[in-house]
Regions:
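Carboxylate-rich, polar loop motifs that coordinate divalent cations or form catalytic acidic clusters
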Residues: 1-299
Length: 299
């Protein structure tokens, strides 16, 4: 199900990237939509790469914005150097390439040559019948792993240029996951439980008995990773975790709207909502303000 239809994308640079918090008085907003060349106004993911190109994954293709123009990448039946599917779910940068999860396969895009390699990871060649069937992760060393719903976890072997299966016994219970810079893997299970183990243990065949429970006693709906910190969400509650997976802050938001994203920036956390709007939560003062620069149609 689509999270939100964007009428326009607004890049508040201090939120999306690394501009200091003290620059709030000088926010710069850039409006981009399909009028400017974006393939679709419904956006699933955004990534700024090392060259500061903005990559935008939509429901109808991948877009690269360099500050002046938009380059688009879309599936073409007659072009093997096109992406495997136009619904872009996730973008990860690693070693000069972008790894792109779509609704039908994973793609590796060489940023220098623009060569695209497709990895379907399915033997039946059928399009998955559920959304977000491919979920990517990256280890601290730059290893790429992928969860394929119904098939399990896979790790990319660069010398063989293929994904090899990881022998685990709990993949069918995983709804979502994320890998931190310290090589801890947080899993959101189908029953709402949140558990974790080390990346090294996962790729070496970690089992369900190896999973450790996060220090909260309520099921959650979403997990986020920002600035090396895990963030969990259930309804209007946000749980910011410590490195040892205990709860650092339990935040109750003054809104019943479903959360779409949570991003850390110094002592602040920016929280956006699926139905539109965004707040800046001060983690030291435990206060928040609404960002009036953002249209209520954006999340």
């Amino acid at each position: 199900m689509r999270n939100i239809l964007y009428v326009q994308i607004i890049f508040i640079l201090i939120i999306a990237f690394v501009t200091p918090i003290k620059s709030y008085a000088f926010n710069v907003a850039k409006h981009i939509s399909n009028v400017n060349g974006l393939t679709n106004n419904s956006v699933n993911c955004i990534l700024e790469d090392e060259e500061h190109t903005i990559w935008i994954g939509t429901w109808d293709g991948l877009n690269a914005y360099n500050g002046r123009e938009i380059t688009t990448f879309r599936y073409s039946k007659n072009n093997p150097n096109s992406i495997s599917n136009n619904v872009i779910r996730q973008i990860i940068e690693c070693k000069g390439s972008l790894w792109i999860a779509t609704d039908n396969g994973v793609n590796r895009l060489d940023k220098r040559t623009r060569q695209i390699t497709r990895y379907y990871l399915r033997t039946d060649n059928k399009v998955p019948n559920q959304e977000k069937s491919f979920i990517l992760g990256k280890s601290a060393a730059g290893d790429i792993i992928c969860l394929i719903k119904g098939l399990g976890f896979f790790v990319y072997n660069d010398s063989e240029d293929e994904f090899n299966p990881i022998n685990t016994d709990f993949a069918s219970h995983v709804k979502d996951y994320s890998v931190s810079d310290s090589d801890h893997v947080l899993f959101l299970l189908n029953n709402g439980s949140s558990v974790y183990l080390s990346y090294n243990l996962l790729v070496n065949g970690g089992k369900q008995d190896d999973l450790r429970t996060v220090g909260i006693h309520t099921p959650v709906d979403k997990i986020f990773l920002s600035k090396g910190r895990f963030i969990l969400n259930k309804d209007n509650r946000i749980f910011l975790l410590n490195p040892d997976f205990t709860v650092s802050q339990d935040i109750e938001l003054d809104s019943n709207k479903p959360v779409s994203q949570a991003i850390l920036a110094e002592d602040n956390m920016f929280v956006s909502f699926i139905e539109g709007g965004c707040i800046n939560y001060d983690l030291r003062k435990n206060t928040f303000t609404y960002l009036n620069e953002l249209s209520n149609q954006l999340s």
